[in-house]
Amino acid sequence: MGYYNNVFDECNDQTDIGRVIRDGREVILQAYNWESHKYDWWRNLDGKVPDIAKSGFTSAWLPPPSQSLAPEGYLPQDLYSLNSAYGSEHLLKSLLRKMKQYKVRAMADIVINHRVGTTRGHGGMYNRYDGISLPWDEHAVTSCTGGLGNRSTGDNFNGVPNVDHTQHFVRKDIIGWLRWLRNTVGFQDFRFDFARGYSANYVKEYIGAAKPLFSVGECWDSCNYNGHGLDYNQDSHRQRIISWIDATGQISAAFDFTTKGILQEAVKGQYWRLCDAQGKPPGVMGWWPSRAVTFLDNHDTGSTQAHWPFPSHHVMEGYAYILTHPGIPCVFYDHFYDWGSSIHDQIVKLIDIRRRQDIHSRSTVRVLKAESNLYAAIVGEKICMKLGDGSWCPSGRDWTLATSGHRYAVWHK
């Protein structure tokens, strides 16, 4: 089993950067997709804030706020310019004020692995940042991506200058920008994009300096496959994510790509995958649930990019799993707002059950059945749930059906 220590969880005298993780009652909405920049997005979300709050979401993950060479926001250039394809700085700040009014935290997508230059420098590459805020020169760019800085401390993001986080002046400027987002603009949470691209030690430094209430990193690499498909044992995959979390000083969560990879195969009649060799959930959720942000799809895996989509006919089975289980569930905008009122309302019902039964990120899981066409578990000793078309219901008169849908059912005591 993967190793971690839970000193951080047990400390009650941490600063507020630990409070949200210790509480463990988060439900996140990813509030955009890959096409959102084509619409008046900040204004669109402004109109949805009351529903987001009423539905039980504690935080909404917003797209990258800064000016970017690509409209989606993932090729940032002038970090301090908040006029983007999603809308103006004025509309963004208005949205953030409304979210605060409705007690929904705003999560900023922090894209600091790479930055597009404005002028040509060393080697004729666009690796200088003249004429904009944070006017770095080539020493801010890693040597492996055309700069005069040091080698990268992580994986390269090809095609654009990668930021050299070993440089003190770079880290100082990034911290200043993060503090500005946190204290002046109005974001409370951070999501670190392409977190494999630089050492988790720097994530630890940035969180410690800017003090977001909650942070999550994107550590996405391939699951373990063999000639016949997905391996049953994904321990090495989840251990890589666990190791990244540990290297942040345990103060950041991470997206549970292991659970996503397993769950989207399990719903195809392979529910035996949802129980590991120790009888626990097989993803990061099974080893370190308080740091595991579970999800079905995001703007990369789903939406119009569809790099690794969850099977569309099984989406509600997926949400019945992550919304009743430990970890920190994250719901995708498309599923919640674009796939019809039935799915929207079923998700809201599951969130409501989670709240009423006080299921949280550390709730216990007792797997009762994990067969080809049936998965059943008791979570927190408060709810019981099943997935699949196998016939099953909990024994005992204590259980009352709370909700059900296509290939899922949930009971409570």
From Swiss-Prot:
* Residues given in the record as substrate binding sites: 74-75, 191-196, 220, 222, 239, 246, 280, 286-288, 299, 305, 386, 411
* Inducers of expression: Circadian-regulated, with a peak in expression at the beginning of the light period.
Q: Which domain of life is it from?
A: Eukaryota
Q: Which GO terms describe its molecular function?
A: alpha-amylase activity; calcium ion binding
SUPFAM superfamilies (UniProt xref): (Trans)glycosidases, Glycosyl hydrolase domain
Q: What happens when the gene is disrupted?
A: No visible phenotype under normal growth conditions.
**GO CC field:** cytosol; extracellular region
Q: Which cofactor does it need?
A: Ca(2+)
| Principal subcellular localisation of the protein | cytoplasm
Tell me which residues are marked as the site Transition state stabilizer: 300
List keywords of the entry alphabetically. Carbohydrate metabolism, Cytoplasm, Glycosidase, Hydrolase, Metal-binding
- What are the positions of the active site? 193 (nucleophile), 218 (proton donor)
Task: Kindly name one Pfam family recorded for this protein.
Answer: Alpha-amyl_C2
Q: Catalyses which reaction?
A: Endohydrolysis of (1->4)-alpha-D-glucosidic linkages in polysaccharides containing three or more (1->4)-alpha-linked D-glucose units
Q: Name one GO biological process term.
A: carbohydrate metabolic process
Q: State which Enzyme Commission number(s) the record gives.
A: 3.2.1.1
Q: Metal-binding: present as a keyword of the record?
A: yes
Q: What function does the entry list?
A: Probable alpha-amylase that does not seem to be required for breakdown of transitory starch in leaves.
Family statement: Belongs to the glycosyl hydrolase 13 family.
Listed name of the protein: Probable alpha-amylase 2
Species name = Arabidopsis thaliana
